Each structure stands twice: as structure tokens, then as C-alpha cells.
């Protein structure tokens, strides 16, 4: 009986040692990953915007007077909003603009700027939502136009979520009106936030 109990205790001890070693290995692996890869829930303000992801985008110049141009831009099913607007700004050499839009998305990612981390905290929305409001501007960072937009999105129960738009896939449509100005607006790096912010005094 004593031998059986001894073998049983030895087996329990062996299992405990194996489990402890496994836990230590997993914790070390997780720590190494956190040091070498970015947090999937956050995004750097300098992250690039993908291009060429809005093949269904349609554009029409509605009017032009004194260098001010008014456009209507319509994005179709599955077009990605930030990609399409960035492509439009580059192709039309937009150096300063403002815009607003309505429509709907099949999915979207908005964000909230975390001052302590100096990064955007991502808020994924994996459902069909109505675009209640979308406003934004375009200005130059160096020689490249940068699109900056905020949105308010409504779920099927009327719940609103919103923030800085990171990406969104259109369904069924996005109807956007944009006014472009002849004078350029420039962004300047702000070391306190690591953001590039519009400085209207720069020319």
C-alpha cells in the first residue's frame, strides 16, 4: 500500500513539474511576442493608408469658381473609404479640402487617441451600420495629401459609436460632397502627441 501511495505521489509531483514548466514557457513566449510585435488593439498615427481598394469609386466635378472646386464622390459596394479618398486626393492634386458624407458600411474600424500611449486605440465594428455623420479634411504632410475624418455610426438598435475613422467597407453606398480650395494647408509634427496637425500659418 505504501509503495502504491509513493508511486501516486511521485506521479502527481511529475505532473505538477510538467505543468509548471509549460506555464513558464507560455509566459516567456508571450513576453517575447509583446516585445517584438505591436499591440493588435492599437495603431500608430504614422501607419500608412492602403491604396487601390476602392475600384467602384465615381467622381464628378460639380462646379469651379475662383479656384474652388466642388466634387461629388460616390463609393460602391465593398469599396474601402480611406483608400478611395486618399487615391482621389492624390489623383486630383488636392492640397486643402473639407468634406461630409452619408451612407452605410458593412464593417468599419474607428479609433480613439490614447494620449498616454500616443497611439490610436482601435474599435472594430463587425456589423452593418448606418453612417449618421462623416466629416473631414484634407491637408498636406510634406508633399502628400492626408485624409482625416471622424464618423458617427448607428447599429440596428440605434446605438451610436464613433471616432477617428481608420477603415470602412461601403455597403451599399457612400455619397460624399467635397470642396477643394486653391490655397494649400500643411500639417506639422507635434512632439507632444506625435501627431501631424494642421498649422494654418504654414505656406
Go through the PLM ranges and name each one.
Residues 102:
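Active-site-proximal beta-strand/loop segments in catalytic clefts of secreted hydrolases
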Residues 2-16:
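Bacterial N-terminal signal peptides that target proteins for export
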Residues 29-31:
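Boundary at the C-terminal end of the N-terminal hydrophobic targeting segment
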Residues 1, 5, 22-27, 47, ...:
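A general, composition-driven signal for non-globular sequence regions
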Residues 33-79, 83-90, 96-97, 106-147, ...:
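N-terminal intrinsically disordered, cationic/polar leader segments
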Residues 14-24:
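Bacterial N-terminal signal peptides
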Amino acid at each position: 500500500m505504501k509503495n502504491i501511495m509513493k508511486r501516486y505521489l511521485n506521479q502527481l509531483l511529475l505532473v505538477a513539474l510538467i505543468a509548471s514548466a509549460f506555464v513558464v514557457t507560455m509566459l516567456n513566449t508571450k513576453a517575447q511576442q509583446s516585445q517584438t510585435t505591436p499591440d493588435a488593439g492599437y495603431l500608430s498615427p504614422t501607419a500608412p493608408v492602403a491604396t487601390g481598394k476602392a475600384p467602384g469609386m465615381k467622381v464628378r466635378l460639380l462646379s469651379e469658381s475662383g479656384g474652388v472646386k466642388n466634387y461629388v464622390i460616390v463609393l460602391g459596394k465593398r469599396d474601402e473609404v480611406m483608400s478611395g479618398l486618399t487615391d482621389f486626393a492624390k489623383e486630383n492634386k488636392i492640397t486643402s479640402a473639407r468634406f461630409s458624407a452619408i451612407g452605410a458600411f458593412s464593417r468599419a474600424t474607428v479609433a480613439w487617441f490614447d494620449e498616454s500611449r500616443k497611439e490610436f486605440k482601435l474599435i472594430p465594428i463587425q456589423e452593418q451600420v448606418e453612417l449618421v455623420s462623416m466629416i473631414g479634411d484634407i491637408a498636406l504632410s510634406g508633399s502628400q495629401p492626408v485624409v482625416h475624418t471622424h464618423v458617427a455610426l448607428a447599429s440596428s438598435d440605434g446605438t451610436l459609436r464613433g471616432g477617428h475613422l481608420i477603415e470602412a467597407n461601403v455597403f451599399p453606398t457612400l455619397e460624399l460632397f467635397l470642396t477643394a480650395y486653391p490655397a494649400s494647408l500643411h500639417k506639422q509634427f507635434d512632439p507632444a502627441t506625435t501627431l501631424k496637425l494642421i498649422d494654418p500659418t504654414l505656406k
